Amino acid sequence: MQFQKEAFMASEHVQTIDLTNFSGRVFFLADPHGHYSTLCNLIHSISEPDEELIVFSTGNLFDYGPEPMELMTAINTGIFDGRSVRVFSAAGAGEEMLKKLLPINKDRRTYYPSTFLNERWCARGGRWHKQINRNYLEEEICKLLSTQLATVMKMLFKGNISIGICPSDYTDIRQGFNNTYNALLAFNQANVNIFQSQFLYGMDHAVRPVNVSDVNLVVLGRNPVNSIRKAHGLPLTNLPVLIGNCLHINTGSLYMSEISSPALLAPGIPPTTVPAITLVELILASTPTLICHQMILNKNGIYTQNTAPLNLDSNDNNIEATL
């Protein structure tokens, strides 16, 4: 799969992907947490070898999971167990810690040989990096950073459709998505730091139904959909849920792993009893629709795959914004 260089513009904090001429299949993914094999199984079950696939992720790609390095390698090569898949991801909290592995210069390493920040990351799912050759890992991280890991992403589709993606929440630094995007583009790191925790850990748009202007949809991760559903009195189906025009898609794949110290997890991440890896597919037709593809880990330890339309007009999946 080949993309023109101008099809994706990236800076340190924002990224635009122009898919107005893309004719393949488009998916959204939240918080895969290193479950590479499960994701590959889902991809193989819903696609054919000759199809063009592109996946946009909200971040939290690697930590806590069983195969973080396998997933990183697949993202960098664009090959998922023999299937060609292009992945672009925002930077979640795990990726922001991952970035600190890179030296500020060749003589100064933030995490070398061991620091409080490094141990804090290890305690929160990042210990896997200690098992990887440092030079090799730094090379792979540099490859990631050359194509992705911004705080805010914007996708442009035919029909003047635009979709934003953030790790956990969106916040209006300036009025409207486009002005906020441009502010992040102009900010230095110190200014970004003022707002970054809201993008990485926030949940305002999971609680309060608000329409973000300038985009048709904002896709968000981290906050589990069943906890959002419970807060709004919706059925606990573990399906993505639309709050305002913010689509929350984290279906709890974190809990496909054994979490030895759940108390260390950030507030707002309650256990999901029947977790799933979910790919939300965008079908661009005269009326755009969404299809939900899930690989579900049942309580008996057996995985099942399910595909169904995601009806965002249903009161079971939608809390509309109020003026």
What is the role of each PLM region?
Residues 1-74:
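N-terminal active-site segment of His-dependent metallophosphoesterases
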Residues 242-323:
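Binuclear metal-dependent phosphoesterase catalytic core
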Residues 33-35, 63, 96, 170, ...:
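Short, glycine/acidic-enriched loop or turn micro-motifs at the edges of active sites
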Residues 123-264, 270:
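Acidic, His/Gly-enriched loop-helix segments that form or flank divalent-metal centers
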Residues 64-163, 172, 194:
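Active-site neighborhood of divalent metal-dependent phosphoester bond hydrolases
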Residues 14-22, 44-48, 73-80, 153-161, ...:
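A short acidic-Thr-Gly-centered motif at the start of a beta-strand
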Residues 53, 83-87, 244:
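A short helix->loop->beta-strand "cap" motif at the edges of active sites that frequently abuts
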Residues 28-30, 55-59, 88-93, 218-223, ...:
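Active-site neighborhood of phospho(di)ester-bond hydrolases with catalytic His/Asp-centered motifs
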